[in-house]
Amino acid sequence: MLVLGIETSCDETGVALYDSSKGLLAHRLYSQVDEHAMYGGVVPEIASRDHLRKLLPLVREVLAAGGVRRTAIGGIAYTAGPGLIGALLVGAAVARSLAWAWSVPAIAVHHMEGHLLAPLLEPEPPEFPFVALLVSGGHTLLVEVRGIGVYQVLGESLDDAAGEAFDKTAKLLGLGYPGGPALARLAEKGRAERFHFPRPMTDRPGLDFSFSGLKTHALNVLAALPGTPQDKADIACAFQAAIVDTLVLKCRRAMRETGLGRLVVAGGVSANQAVRKGLQAMAESERYRVYFPRPEFCTDNGAMIAFAGCWRLRAGQFEPSAIEARARWAMETLTAV
């Protein structure tokens, strides 16, 4: 089955073609970073308008790159949530319109399920069951995964997600947008041992996260200093180390509690090299296997949506023609495949 995937949950427009027998045929991604940089963050109205401007040209480009005629498309998958509601509606409307025009079924895909399944696009994919750490700008989740759609959330962020904490702290340090990658680059020049940042919620049982206090701690440390470039680099390094240590501890705890031996790490923050190294070191010491998507599939993309949608469409799951978009959507409500 050949599926067209559409991703428009935030500020990146992703389109891809996935074939159930041949794999990923083509994918394209348009980032709106330059459009939002002057505002220091994503402006929802601008994001929606830019998706509308770029989506159909990207669809045509992907079809051409994949050497596919529209008559070969067997279904369309689109991100229906969670995300920015205006951006989601653009993708949903285009996907539903194309599905109607081409007389093919369409399936609404959960954005975080797309991230969770992204490592399955790799040459050596993980086998079920596994524990998944989904770590992005909007979410930080630990999930026990027994199959596609068989999810139990073990822990989640009670306030800021890890990626959100990266972006907010980067803004405090006067870094540009997107803040997470900028902070990671600055941290390479810093000394983590100069400042002690707390490891939130690691001194108690449970698998939930809380990262908002790290931003406040960074603000207080910065306020007591001259704010030299080295001061900021050291703060960035200590902040990042606190995030990494917290993620590592919670993942180790989740693996021990579930008794599973495979860990999947996905979402935008999984591209962070310090996060990868910390989790890889933990996995090696504990004799677990850890899986990451390639960097281009860590951030939002159409390939993961096409892949997730293909599994569900092949299982006979699709919705009527109503346009579906949800700003919030619990993973545990998804149907098993």
From Swiss-Prot:
Q: What is its main location?
A: cytoplasm
Cofactor: binding comment: Binds 1 Fe(2+) ion per subunit.
Q: What is its EC number?
A: 2.3.1.234
Cofactors per UniProt? Answer: Fe(2+)
Catalysed reactions, semicolon-separated: L-threonylcarbamoyladenylate + adenosine(37) in tRNA = N(6)-L-threonylcarbamoyladenosine(37) in tRNA + AMP + H(+)
The Gene Ontology CC terms held by the record are: cytoplasm
Keyword match Transmembrane = no
Q: Where does substrate bind?
A: L134, V135, S136, G137, G138, D167, G180, N272
Protein keywords: Acyltransferase, Cytoplasm, Iron, Metal-binding, Transferase, tRNA processing
Q: Which family does it belong to?
A: Belongs to the KAE1 / TsaD family.
- What PANTHER family does the record point to? TRNA N6-ADENOSINE THREONYLCARBAMOYLTRANSFERASE (PTHR11735), TRNA N6-ADENOSINE THREONYLCARBAMOYLTRANSFERASE, MITOCHONDRIAL (PTHR11735:SF6)
From the Swiss-Prot or TrEMBL record, give the protein name: tRNA N6-adenosine threonylcarbamoyltransferase
Gene source species: Methylococcus capsulatus (strain ATCC 33009 / NCIMB 11132 / Bath)
Tell me the name of the encoding gene. tsaD
